[in-house]
Amino acid sequence: VVNSISKTGNATGWRVGWAISPKAYTPALRAFHDTMVIQAPTPFQQAAVTLLELDRSSYVAIRTAYVSRRDLLVGALRHVGFGVSPPQGAYYVFARYADVPRIGGVSPVAATQHLLKQVGVACVPGDNFYAAGGSTSHYLRFAFCRSLSTLKNAAERLASLG
């Protein structure tokens, strides 16, 4: 079992996680781990312990907040023509933009630049996550791990595309 506090703990980038394995595998896991990462800072580890000690209602509240944010962003993207399948466990949306007015016929980089400079919404080209020019050539990635007010503002800005 491998897990982390990244999404649940709103601590992306902290790289605090753990692995549970049969004793026979532990030396190999440690050797691999030692070559891949450094120790997480002590305050991050202490924060992770605090997170793991929360009661179930805290996790339900975190999930509810993410679902609200996801649904807001997905609705805003669909409203202007993005093709979107709502994610079930991530805090980002991978959206097809081929049918979106003003950006449908351009490259992923040009689409992200237009959205940032003309609309005021930041996203990342889908090609950053897959081979360029493949089936992801008309996809953009939007994150919804922001405040609800920031996402509402982004939704209003995205509406200008339609």
Summary of predicted features, one role per range:
Residues V1-G162:
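PLP-dependent class I/II
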